């Protein structure tokens, strides 16, 4: 039981060391994440569009679809 108490005391001590970001830092990081997400989404959309067109052309040339 003493080990469990020690564990929780150490967890609380470590939790007190956490430094939370300021509102400005949080919003800046959030904005960066949104921009990267949007760019990545557009990138994969374009790749999907290109590959689906290529595959459709191949299937059409082979008379499959």
Curated annotation (Swiss-Prot):
Residues 1-34 are cytoplasmic. GO terms for molecular function: protein transmembrane transporter activity. Disulfide bonds: none annotated. InterPro entries: SecE_bac, SecE_sf, Translocase_SecE/Sec61-g. Residues 52-65 are extracellular. It comes from the Bacteria. It is a single-pass membrane protein. Keywords: Cell inner membrane, Cell membrane, Membrane, Protein transport, Translocation, Transmembrane, Transmembrane helix, Transport. It is found in: Cell inner membrane. The chain crosses the membrane at residues 35-51. One of its GO terms (biological process) is intracellular protein transmembrane transport. One of its GO terms (cellular component) is plasma membrane. Component of the Sec protein translocase complex. Heterotrimer consisting of SecY, SecE and SecG subunits. The heterotrimers can form oligomers, although 1 heterotrimer is thought to be able to translocate proteins. Interacts with SecDF, and other proteins may be involved. The channel interacts with SecA via subunit SecY. NCBIfam families: secE_bact. Essential subunit of the protein translocation channel SecYEG. Clamps together the 2 halves of SecY. May contact the channel plug during translocation. Belongs to the SecE/SEC61-gamma family. This is Protein translocase subunit SecE. The lineage of its organism: Bacteria, Thermotogati, Thermotogota, Thermotogae, Thermotogales.
């Amino acid at each position: 039981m003493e080990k469990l108490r020690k564990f929780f005391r150490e967890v609380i001590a470590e939790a007190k060391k956490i430094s939370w970001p300021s509102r400005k830092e949080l919003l800046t990081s959030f904005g960066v994440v949104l921009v990267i997400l949007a760019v990545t989404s557009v990138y994969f959309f374009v790749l999907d569009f290109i590959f689906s067109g290529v595959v459709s052309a191949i299937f059409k040339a082979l008379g499959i679809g």
